[in-house]
């Protein structure tokens, strides 16, 4: 039987010309403009400006600043120096395979561009209803499955309003996820700022405003929870006006939509506002090229291995494409939409879940589809080598280990395993947010996946605590950890981990010795004794006094001697303590120069942890 000829459909998508994007900047003066790439030492800068090093050093010396050949001048200083020499200046960037993905520049013709869905990021304070709003829009709910009612990682979804698609990115509201919210703002075309009408603006509201302004994107305010009795939308409008987010009804240019995500009120008006802004801004992309975009989320999936949620920002992504994503690469084996339906392709602004990577990508990494696997592997390897060099450089430049070794710092070693990259980032970010003098944390290992035998062995040798966030160790691994004395701590709520880490860090500090006054006695009469010296006849005026307790002798409010009680009697009997309003006789070790009306302050030294000391 004759074989059928199966024709492969020709792929007409444009591939990035990697060589064309590689650029090495020539540093120097060209046509009255000094072109440079980064901070330079005076020794490096002078010949490029056609000046002597002495001339530049003397310029600063005359300003009262002493520099030498090795002094590094930053970009601003170089710019100022250029202006003094009547030169314009321009900062350019060297582009190589190590930083190619962050420096892709498309030269698409206007005729090749088509309208794409707006990318909308929902931001706002924790518990103000962002996820509920997105759930209402999607007609589904994931809120109940999120521990503590806080969205633990970014989700990206595309919906239809009529026949027009809108892509939504949901960002976590908790303080630990600042980096993820910043990433969401930088990916987006429009920010939806959700503010609860019964609560007003809060910390993350202000942070979201800052991110949106930094990204220079339009803002729509959704005043949520209007169904609440305590709702006060005017308060919200006034608070936001003070932050230069002025509603149209108050003479500004910001669209405000009032409603209730829970009651499905104001949703259609919100969607219409998004589409209106999208139409005005005319968002476009070229679907006829290999895809480029950003990794939204990544995790290790039991069924599919390394899995990443990708947002296509330009081009079309197809099943079977070769991808480089940060320091990893792969060939797309499976592609799923936001509802886990397997699909063959994704157009611009489409979020998809993709499998087929060699390793779990890092959330926030750019991705690029390439014509062949060899090229993808080579670029990924170059990026990986750059990361290794940076890590080694940071380790070598840090003096933390030396301080730990000589006792200047206390240290906690941690191994963190998490279910998804976004959560891992947030946990790592907590280290930067906690600052307790004298204590540091060392992250021995951080990775996505379950807790393994190698984690336990590493924890054993490095004296580390293993943190599992939404991942667990199986019984065999738990038994191994118990047998070698390794502690495994499991979490599913980010702020619980933060609380515990703070407690551990404070717990590693040496206890603070605090003096606590337990009693006072007033000297009423003095008796001289040939063997024991001066006996003080006292009345306890406050608290109690104890034999062998530490004392301060105060005269007119001034401490004149520190010692301890040598003997203590009550009614001629030796006793261990005497309470308030009772009289006693006592002697003070090695001190006889006591006078009537002196106050004997009795105190003890107590060890306290740092939380107890205010």
From Swiss-Prot:
Q: Which residues form the tr-type G domain?
A: 115-283
**Signal peptide position in this chain?**
none
Sequence positions that bind GTP? 124-131, 170-174, 224-227
Where are the residues of the annotated region G4? 224-227
Q: Does the keyword Nucleotide-binding apply?
A: yes
Region described as G1: 124-131
According to the UniProt record, where is the region G5?
260-262
Location of region: G3 = 170-173
Please state the protein's primary subcellular location.
Answer: cytoplasm
Pfam families noted in UniProt? EF-G_D2, GTP_EFTU, IF-2, IF2_N
Name a GO CC annotation attached to this entry: cytosol
Top-rank taxon of the source lineage equals Bacteria
G2: annotated span:
149-153
Record's subcellular location: Cytoplasm
Q: What are the UniProt keywords, alphabetically?
A: Cytoplasm, GTP-binding, Initiation factor, Nucleotide-binding, Protein biosynthesis
**GO terms, molecular function:** GTP binding; GTPase activity; translation initiation factor activity
Q: So what does this one do?
A: One of the essential components for the initiation of protein synthesis. Protects formylmethionyl-tRNA from spontaneous hydrolysis and promotes its binding to the 30S ribosomal subunits. Also involved in the hydrolysis of GTP during the formation of the 70S ribosomal complex.
Q: Which family does it belong to?
A: Belongs to the TRAFAC class translation factor GTPase superfamily. Classic translation factor GTPase family. IF-2 subfamily.
Q: What NCBIfam families does the record point to? A: IF-2 (TIGR00487), small_GTP (TIGR00231)
Q: Which HAMAP family match?
A: IF_2_B
Instruction: Spell out the protein name for this chain.
Output: Translation initiation factor IF-2
This protein's encoding gene: infB
